[in-house]
Amino acid sequence: MIVERVSVVGSVAGPLSDIFAQFLPPIGWATVLRRTFHEMNDDDCWGLAAQLAFYFLLALFPTVLVLVALIGYLPLDNVFNELLAAVATVAPPEVVILIRTQFDQVGTGNRVGFLTVGILGAIWSSSAATSALIDALNTAYDIKDWRAWWKRRLLAIVLTFGLAIAVVLSLALMLIGPKALTWSVAWLGLDPFVAALWQMARWPAVIVVVILVLDLMFYLAPNRHVKWVWISPGALMSTILWIGSSLAFRYYVANMSDYAAAYGAIGGAIVTMLWFYVGGLAILVGAEMNAVIEDAAREQLRADPTGQ
C-alpha cells in the first residue's frame, strides 16, 4: 500500500492537543476516504464482498435451525415474531419472509435433533464465513497469512463463537430486556421512567455492541499487530454504512423493485444474498479505512520517531 506522507492533523492548541491527536488520523479525512476507495479497487473488495455474501447465506439455514431449537426452551411468548420484527427494521421484506419460511418448515420437528445438527452446521458454515472474512481483512492490509491452516480455522471458530455471544447479547437487549423491565416495574416497583428510557436506549446499546464486535474482529483477525486506536474509525464507519445501506436497500426492495417477478421462487434468496453483500462491503470499507490510517501513521512514525 503506497500512500503520500502527510504530517499529523494538528493544530489543536492547548494541553489537550496530545490527547486529541492520538484519535485523529495522520492525514486528512478527505484523503483517508479517497485512498480508501482506491484501495478497495486495488484489492477487489467488490469481489471479496461477493465471497462473503455467499458464505453468509450458506450459514443462514443452520443458524435458523439453532434459533428454532433454542427459542423452544425460552419461557417467552412470540419471541421469534418479535425477533423478526426487529430484523424487519433494517432488512428487506424478502429476507424476513425467507427466515420465516425456514422457521415454519423446521419449527414442528425434533427440537433436540435440530439443535444438534444446527450447531454442527452453524459451526462449520459460520466458521467458513469467518475464515473468508479473515482472508478479506488480510487482503485489506496487503499482508500474506503465513499461519497454518488449522490455526486460521481455529481462530475462525473462536471468532465465530464470539460473534454468537454478541448476537445473543444483542437479542437479549432487543427482546428480553424490555420484558425484564416490564416485570421489574410490575413486581419490584421500578420507576416506569427507567423502562421508557430503556425503550429508547436499547437500539443505541445494540449499535455499541456491533461497533465493539467489529473492533475485536479488526484487531484479532488480520495476521498483523494492529494498534487499537486506529481500528475504531473503521468499525464506526462499517456500522454506519451497514445500517444506512441496509435501510436504503430495504426501501428500494420494498418500493421500487420486484425481485419475485424477476427471479421467481429464488427471489428471496437473491435479495438475502444482496443484503449480505451490502453488509460484507460495509465491513471491508472499514477495514480498508483502518489500513490506510495505520499505514500513514506507521510511515509518519518512521519519518519522525519523536512525533514532533
PLM feature spans:
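Membrane-embedded alpha-helices and immediately adjacent juxtamembrane helical segments
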Residues: 1-308
